[in-house]
């Protein structure tokens, strides 16, 4: 789910390049069951990303292996500093990485949880259904 943290990240990344391509994982939960599945279709998410003025193109991928292969065709990769000491797909690819500061507390998982918690009880009582 897009939140202001993503917009800030795209703006920051775009300041380093002329063309910003965003890689969109179709469903991260297929390879990482601990991840929540996307709420919106890949087509809807791609349309939203393309409407952001800092994003020039979006490529989608189903498997981490495909994303790994995409990376070999790009000059620069942008990652949040929260990934610096961890593992991430393509760590072995010889590509320049620009580490973007994540100076916010936004989280897609937290946003999904907040939405769930805000509608759970009213929906159990039958509200929200037309």
Which residues make up each language-model segment?
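Nucleotidyltransferase catalytic core that binds NTPs
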Residues: 1-130
């Amino acid at each position: 789910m897009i939140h202001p943290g993503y917009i800030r990240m795209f703006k920051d990344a775009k300041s380093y390049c002329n063309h910003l391509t965003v890689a969109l994982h179709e469903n991260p939960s297929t390879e990482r069951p601990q991840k929540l599945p996307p709420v919106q279709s890949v087509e809807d998410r791609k349309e939203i990303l393309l409407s952001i003025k800092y994003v020039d193109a979006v490529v989608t991928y189903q498997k981490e292996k495909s994303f790994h292969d995409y990376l070999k065709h790009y000059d620069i990769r942008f990652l949040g500093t929260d990934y610096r000491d961890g593992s991430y797909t393509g760590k072995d690819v010889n590509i320049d990485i620009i580490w973007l500061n994540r100076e916010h507390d936004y989280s897609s998982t937290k946003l999904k949880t907040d939405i769930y918690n805000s509608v759970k009880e009213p929906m159990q009582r039958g509200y929200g259904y037309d």
